[in-house]
Design a protein with these regions (language model features):
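HTH-adjacent hinge/linker in prokaryotic transcriptional regulators
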Residues: 36, 40, 44-91
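Hydrophobic/small residue at the entry helix of a nucleotide-binding pocket
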Residues: 99
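Basic, low-complexity intrinsically disordered segments
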Residues: 108
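NAD(P)-binding Rossmann-fold cofactor-contacting core
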Residues: 111-132
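Extreme N-terminal segment that seeds HTH/winged-HTH DNA-binding domains in transcriptional regulators
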Residues: 1-35
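Phosphate-bearing ligand-interacting subdomains
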Residues: 22-30, 132-229
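Glycine-rich Rossmann-fold phosphate-binding loop(s) that bind the pyrophosphate
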Residues: 96
Length: 229
């Protein structure tokens, strides 16, 4: 069940998006005292097919042990290493509106290796407020904070109008990874990674799925209609 260190770019992007869920499931299993897990069990806990899970883990060099499965502690360590969360990542949140404040107060980031070390806003009226145990800093302090605290990830929770400027400030300060909750495409250099979480888009997708289910439930089956005559 040994794993060879994977090259980051050798792992498909779709696989990378599923690895955090596997890691979260493993943490839950470990907390419950589970020391080994089959691919079927881990797949069920993660909401994927076992064939998909085995394929994803094969990109890390793991194939499990027939009849035994995966060692939970070992697989947890290897997934954490592959995802880069064997270290703690200092994170800054820009934008202290309702969403930014909620993100700053969320206690679930630290256990996953992400430490919120700075919160910022361009509005002087918000500077100095206490959010998530931190004092809101002005955007002009961003370069100093990035240098002092080693901030590597920035979270955008600004208005649409302020998103690009905030992203530019993060990049100029040396931040090369941005998680944006703003529903707008950002123009960034090739070396900067951006992930966008568009809550409205996700709601649209859910609305479409529910509407499709409703239509399917109320549309007569052509075979049944023919038989009715």
């Amino acid at each position: 069940m040994s794993m060879q260190p994977p090259e980051r770019r050798d792992i498909p992007a779709a696989t990378v998006t599923r690895l955090p869920q596997y890691l979260r499931s493993l943490h839950t299993l470990a907390a419950g005292g589970v020391t080994s897990v089959s691919s079927d069990e881990l797949a069920a806990a993660s909401g994927v097919r076992s064939t998909q899970l085995r394929k994803d883990l094969s990109h890390l060099g793991s194939h499990g042990v027939r009849g035994v499965g995966y060692d939970v502690a070992h697989l947890t360590a290897e997934l954490a290493r592959a995802l880069g969360v064997t270290r703690t990542w200092p994170v800054a949140i820009v934008g202290m509106g309702n969403l930014g404040r909620a993100l700053a107060a969320y206690s679930g980031f630290a256990p996953e290796g992400f430490d919120i070390v700075a919160v910022l806003d361009h509005d002087p009226a918000l500077v100095g407020d206490s959010v998530g145990g931190l004092s809101v800093r002005p955007m002009t302090d961003l370069p100093i904070l990035v240098a002092e605290k080693g901030i590597g990830i920035g979270v955008l929770a600004t208005s649409v109008a302020g998103a690009q400027s905030a992203a530019d400030s993060l990049i100029a300060a040396g931040v090369e990874a941005i998680l944006s909750f703003v529903p707008v495409a950002l123009a960034v250099p090739p070396h900067v990674s951006v992930r966008r979480v568009d809550l409205a888009t996700e709601l649209h997708v859910l609305a479409f799925l529910r509407q499709s289910d409703s239509i399917a439930a109320t549309t007569p089956n052509p075979t049944d209609v023919g038989r009715a005559g």
